[in-house]
Amino acid sequence: AAQTINRIIDVFPAHQQGQIRTQLSLVLEGIVCQTLLRKANAPGRIVALEIMVPTPAIRNLIREDKIHQIYSAMQTGQEKLGMQTMNQCLTTLYLQKQITMETALSASSNKDELTEMINRGAGVVPGAGLGRAPVPAQRR
């Protein structure tokens, strides 16, 4: 998600980037990055998601050009806001045996962190992320 913000800002000339950061921090509604991964034990693919919700702290980081700190804010905003990093999602998918270790590592931009998270068994908080829509309540 942080890379997405940098890509948006970098489209503009250097002299406009401060103004663009400010505007982006005010209007951003969220960022969802996704990739399709080969399933481990079944044909087909499964989606891995990185989800960022622009909290006041994240909006401030964008304004102050501290984009590199957004990743930490996403990690800590997981349980309350449903945010997740790609590595958190990959860890969960691996621990659920949805994807192989090779697939998880190939999709990760920080393989050392991913390996550490998998070894700790630390994935996504239950109910947060993974892009699953809630199951609709049955009518009575």
Per-range role (PLM):
Residues 1-140:
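Short, flexible helix-loop junctions that flank or precede catalytic/ligand sites
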